[in-house]
């Protein structure tokens, strides 16, 4: 049982949906992003997705791409991201943390070294957007052997022939990308997403979380209501990019979380 598994079990017992929040590590600097991260649980966040900045973020929209650039320009590295997690864990041992990003920084560090450091720091799961199931031996299987969940993305183009392969070694939860394209690109509609979520849930016992295109508490409520929860990223990262005070960012997160929890 991981912290992610425990969180979903608790939420089910409470009759609540999960609210997952994404932030970019080191955006705009280490101090600010750590302050936001530390405030997320009190704002109602059930699971934290922590973005690893990367120089070529092909799946990210302009908001998150720019956040990654700000973080890299501010000196953020994988080492400093792991330091962020350790600092957070010194105060919070309960809230799950999923690192999300691309394979290159992990490969450059060495898979075995990275997994040892990630588990020691207190990471619970990984989302690596550019590693397909055919490459599971590279990272997915070693990560699971190290006790980490490996969370896979399913999309509107993941057909019934492809879905079993996607789900085969997935653990923790399934992240359903509700729209085709890059992050933050459009608004997701529950009426369009519901049949796809039902199709995935028919194929797995894992929780299904909906992400991409959620910007308001109302949308969070609608989309969490047809799944096991929802993820908000670009809408939060945008506030950080605008230089809003940490307290204002967290107030907005709390409103989004309340929407999801009202589902």
From Swiss-Prot:
GO cellular component, one term: cytosol
Catalytic activity from the UniProt record: (1S,2R)-1-C-(indol-3-yl)glycerol 3-phosphate + L-serine = D-glyceraldehyde 3-phosphate + L-tryptophan + H2O
InterPro entries, alphabetized: Aldolase_TIM (IPR013785), RibuloseP-bd_barrel (IPR011060), Trp_synthase_alpha_AS (IPR018204), Trp_synthase_suA (IPR002028)
EC number(s) reported in the record: 4.2.1.20
Pathway(s) of this molecule: Amino-acid biosynthesis; L-tryptophan biosynthesis; L-tryptophan from chorismate: step 5/5
First-tier enzyme category under EC: lyase
UniProt keyword terms in alphabetical order: Amino-acid biosynthesis, Aromatic amino acid biosynthesis, Lyase, Tryptophan biosynthesis
MF (Gene Ontology): tryptophan synthase activity
Active site, renumbered: 49 (proton acceptor), 60 (proton acceptor)
Domain of life from the UniProt record: Bacteria
PROSITE patterns reported in the protein's UniProt record: TRP_SYNTHASE_ALPHA
PANTHER family membership: TRYPTOPHAN SYNTHASE ALPHA CHAIN, CHLOROPLASTIC (PTHR43406:SF1), TRYPTOPHAN SYNTHASE, ALPHA CHAIN (PTHR43406)
Protein family: Belongs to the TrpA family.
Protein task: The alpha subunit is responsible for the aldol cleavage of indoleglycerol phosphate to indole and glyceraldehyde 3-phosphate.
HAMAP family: Trp_synth_alpha (MF_00131)
NCBIfam families in the cross-refs: trpA
Description of how the protein assembles with itself and partners: Tetramer of two alpha and two beta chains.
Name of this protein: Tryptophan synthase alpha chain
